[in-house]
UniProtKB/Swiss-Prot annotation:
Protein's UniProt keywords contain Cytoplasm: yes
Gene Ontology, cellular component aspect: cytoplasm
Lineage: Bacteria, Pseudomonadati, Campylobacterota, Epsilonproteobacteria, Campylobacterales
Cell compartments where the protein resides: Cytoplasm
Source species of the chain: Campylobacter jejuni subsp. jejuni serotype O:6 (strain 81116 / NCTC 11828)
Active site (record annotation): K100
PANTHER family named in the record: THIAZOLE SYNTHASE
Protein's name according to its UniProt entry: Thiazole synthase
Chemical reaction(s) catalysed: [ThiS sulfur-carrier protein]-C-terminal-Gly-aminoethanethioate + 2-iminoacetate + 1-deoxy-D-xylulose 5-phosphate = [ThiS sulfur-carrier protein]-C-terminal Gly-Gly + 2-[(2R,5Z)-2-carboxy-4-methylthiazol-5(2H)-ylidene]ethyl phosphate + 2 H2O + H(+)
Pfam families the record matches: ThiG (PF05690)
Amino acid sequence: MQENLKNDKLKIGKYEFDSRFILGSGKYSLELIKSAIEEAKTQIITLALRRANTGEIANILDYIPKNITLLPNTSGARNADEALRIARLSRELGCGELIKIEVISDSRYLLPDNYETIKACELLAKEGFTPLPYMHADLYAARAMRDAGAAAIMPLAAPIGSNKGLCAKEFIQILLNEIDLPIIVDAGIGSPSQACEAMQMGVSAVMVNTAIAEAKDVALMAKAFSLAVNAGRAAFLAGLASVSKAKASSPLTGFLRD
């Protein structure tokens, strides 16, 4: 089993990673970014392009170690065309071809627009990007995103920033059953135990932002999530026992009347 864990890689398109914990960077002070990355033991960090403005004195890229893979997102895009423009700008800034597609036209609930996200997947894939669409867990939309060129599917667990956990658990399970791409749970994970539960389901990775950024001790919470993700993955690989009725843990033969 130790060998299984050692060789267990997260594969996204042509990329491979040892860590299955993706760290968001949207709510941290710049001073806390580096310590959170170190304690999270992550290899991927998401990045809103507005925080990577190379014309500013305080640039988040200066606080992210060079060995970390950047996953820029299209935050702020309201449709597929806007997502494409942001992705192009990201590539011009040297952020690479991995891109998390975020298309949100609803400012109240901040739910992803699956229809525009499908269109964005197709547009970005045609331009050589490796798209990872953030989406509402829906099988038909996930199939369309896969067919449009998505390298992974990133369903929300609960509304972004809500910390409510796996509200969409049953729908995520359907994606796990039917979609032959990495399923990365994104948004709504509020505690290490929820991240562990998601990994136990068999998702490929978990992304967390708010629950760490708003913790009293950011670095320690990042470490807690990292341990939880690893524990959940190990439990999934080990094979969780599942029974439908009571089963004694000790033999009952020769006991009392027998």
